A protein has these predicted regions:
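An N-terminal hydrophobic leader/cap segment in hydrolases
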Residues: 1-44
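Membrane-embedded segments
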Residues: 48-119
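Short coil/turn segments at beta-strand junctions that form active-site/ligand-binding loops
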Residues: 64, 135-137
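Short, hydrophobic alpha-helix immediately C-terminal to the catalytic nucleophile
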Residues: 82, 122, 151-155
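Alpha/beta-hydrolase active-site loop
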Residues: 112-132
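Primarily recognizes the serine-hydrolase "nucleophile elbow" in alpha/beta-hydrolase
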Residues: 137-181
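A catalytic-pocket lid/entrance helix-loop region that shapes and gates access to the active site
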Residues: 179-194
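Conserved small/polar residues in nucleotide/adenosyl-binding loops
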Residues: 195-202
């Protein structure tokens, strides 16, 4: 859901005492702020199921390729891609940074761990082709749940100019990720969670 469980929210307040972790967090935060101030255009499309999707369009001069960047679960476009944004720009990449459904400024109250997000990814590739005239290659890139979203999008009928996918830290299955979330974030045994879910369906 859009609203995080209370335990998950409190967990964000806990940081390790590692100086390296604190330093890394500050570097990521600074890069995110720089990307947010880089002058990207805020754009909006309507998903296949009618919800509003927000993106940040960052065209470059003389682009050689376009990237659709999908961020992860309970994250943001600037947080997940702030550190790589300059690299992409310096290598002639225009980028569409998507805000995933059910998060931040996009519509919807739920995330589907890639099941619906794959269609959103397709919608963004179509938007780019309408914007640019299908003139240059498109690459799909994602982190965490965003990585799973772009991988699942590969089974759809993507435009011919989608040339590749970069998936960073995708999860292997819905069961695997729910086991991790239930045990690490919700502190509920996975078997108990499955039993509760089955009981609710009866």
């Amino acid at each position: 859901d859009r609203v995080a469980p209370q335990d998950r929210s409190n967990g964000k307040m806990r940081v390790s005492g590692s100086p390296e972790m604190i330093e890394t967090t500050e570097i990521v935060k600074k890069a995110a702020g720089q990307l947010e101030k880089s002058g990207c255009d805020v754009v909006e499309i309507t998903a296949h199921d009618g919800i509003s999707l927000i993106g940040h369009w960052c065209p470059c001069e003389e682009p050689k390729r376009t990237i659709v960047a999908m961020h992860g679960w309970r994250s943001s476009w600037s947080h997940d891609f702030g550190l790589i944004a300059d690299f992409w720009r310096n290598n002639h990449c225009s980028v569409l940074y998507a805000e995933q459904r059910g998060q931040n400024n996009s519509g919807g109250n739920h995330m589907s761990l890639g099941l619906l997000e794959r269609y959103d990814c397709l919608a963004w590739t179509n938007w780019i082709n309408e914007k640019t005239g299908k003139s240059i290659p498109i690459y799909l890139a994602g982190v965490s749940m965003g990585a799973t979203s772009v991988l699942m999008a590969s089974e759809l009928e993507l435009p011919d100019n989608v040339f590749g996918i970069a998936a960073d830290s995708a999860f292997t299955s819905l069961h695997a990720i729910w086991k991790h979330v239930s045990e690490s974030n919700l502190h509920i045994p996975y078997a108990c969670l499955l039993y509760t879910s089955d009981a609710a369906d009866d």
